[in-house]
Amino acid sequence: METNWRLLDTGHRPGPENMAIDEAIAMAHGRGEVPPTLRFYGWNPPAVSIGYFQSMLGEVDLDAVRAGGYGYVRRPTGGRLIFHHMELTYSVVIREELLPGGVIETYREISRGLLAGMAELGVPAALSGGDRDPRRADPDGFHTACFDTASAYELQVGGRKVAGSAQTRRDGVILQHGSILLDIDVPLLFRLMRLPEGIPAERLMARFRAKSTTLAEALGRPVSWAEARDAFAAGFARALGLTLTPGQLTEREEKEAQTLVEAKYGCDNWNMRK
């Protein structure tokens, strides 16, 4: 595996911009213009994202989202609804030839960096087992959100999911991104979702709490975004033997990201397509 990577901290940005930047990095890396990239980012305003195969209108209460001043966007990856609020988000972009293996194998390798980041914080995390493909569309409606079910090789603390990831591949480039929960407001999350009929919200929230956790809960103290960023950067470097060189988006990446916001991620013909 290539071990010289670029490290990006792009701060907190709107949802469409975050997804556009991930895609722009993948395009630039595919052209050989930038090295493999580990990016950390946040969301401002907080936003709901849905997986590529989901229905925005079927999953999200857009009236509640807009009333709260939140954003919304469809991801280029699969998986289920996430409310990006009190979290650290990461993305990894690397060509398939530089990180050989199928989806599960590369997912496991990237998860080694995440697991080491947890160790940097003192969180006793472990990787989930099983063979559930991270690209799978959401299962039945009883699974309400990303963090109530773990895919293979996702991070758990005491059997409860603390980070969720998804991967896609295009033109020989791997893009994997995921959310690491610093904390969570479960009632707020459920107010922004369309819930299955006939199942009380209280029951679904209880299930969610039983299956998910946060860094704050695991450590018994708040964890800042910057503290988590630094810990996971150190974890990736240590576990994968990387040399991480801090950098910035190139001018072309910035321009292509803006074009993608205007033509794709900021548009209803993408976000409402299903």
From Swiss-Prot:
UniProt-recorded Gene Ontology molecular function terms: lipoyl(octanoyl) transferase activity
GO annotation, biological process: lipoate biosynthetic process; protein modification process
EC number: 2.3.1.181
PROSITE patterns, sorted: BPL_LPL_CATALYTIC (PS51733)
Domain BPL/LPL catalytic, chain residue ranges per copy: 32-244
Function: Catalyzes the transfer of endogenously produced octanoic acid from octanoyl-acyl-carrier-protein onto the lipoyl domain of GcvH, an intermediate carrier during protein lipoylation.
Subunit field text: Monomer.
Protein name, UniProt field: Octanoyltransferase LipM
